[in-house]
Amino acid sequence: MTMAETGAPPSALALFAWLSPGFPVGAYAYSHALEWAAEAGDITDESSLESWLRDLMLLGFGRADGILLAHAYGAGAAGDVPALAQVNARAVALSPTAELRLETCQQGRSFLDAVRAAWPHGGLDAAAAHLPPDVAYPVAVGYAAALHGVPRAAVLEAYLFAVTQTLVSAALRIAPIGQTAGTRVVARLMPAVQALAGDIPTLTLDDLGTATFRADLGSMRHETQYTRLFRS
């Protein structure tokens, strides 16, 4: 049976497509409170951006997203839609603010719909029927990757790196940081992101938790920020 008949994508190409800026999930519309951090003076240059993002990825939502993705992947590998629903419910409940819930759920539902349309799979149809409208982004990515045979280690690294790049791209639009400086930030964060991806398979759902309180408070304040480019 050919790939065209099964709809199964080659692993690497699937990740390039699914996590590219051009994939229709609307990632460009969200800053995960970076817009508020720039307005408040927390992010003013290359160094402060790197520090903020390092904390977000290692102590905040990056680590949490990785854990959720890995467990959604496990549910997909086992064909266990009820387990997937439990992981998704935990993911949505952990969103600390309305805007961050919108950020993950809008992207998650859009991702699920786009993959179902272009890379159909019965497991994706089952998930779409069983899950509520709110589907967390890492949950959708992990589940789809498992169904289509993308290695867990590869999707963890790719997802976390893609999120990092997306946030750096957002920062370039709201802070006095140039493209070369942003590229340096991405390069310096790569080893930490790769190490995080390697650690995540040893973690359980009981290890979920974040310690980025100022970013969470910033997301709340962003809801009433006077001038905004981003939805979060």
UniProtKB/Swiss-Prot annotation:
| Entry annotated with the keyword Chaperone | yes
Q: Pfam families under this entry? A: UreF
GO molecular function term, any single one: nickel cation binding
Do you know which InterPro entries this protein is assigned to?
UreF, UreF_sf
Q: Which family does it belong to?
A: Belongs to the UreF family.
Q: What does this protein do?
A: Required for maturation of urease via the functional incorporation of the urease nickel metallocenter.
HAMAP family in the record = UreF
Protein name per its UniProtKB record: Urease accessory protein UreF
Protein's organism: Azorhizobium caulinodans (strain ATCC 43989 / DSM 5975 / JCM 20966 / LMG 6465 / NBRC 14845 / NCIMB 13405 / ORS 571)
Q: Which gene encodes it?
A: ureF
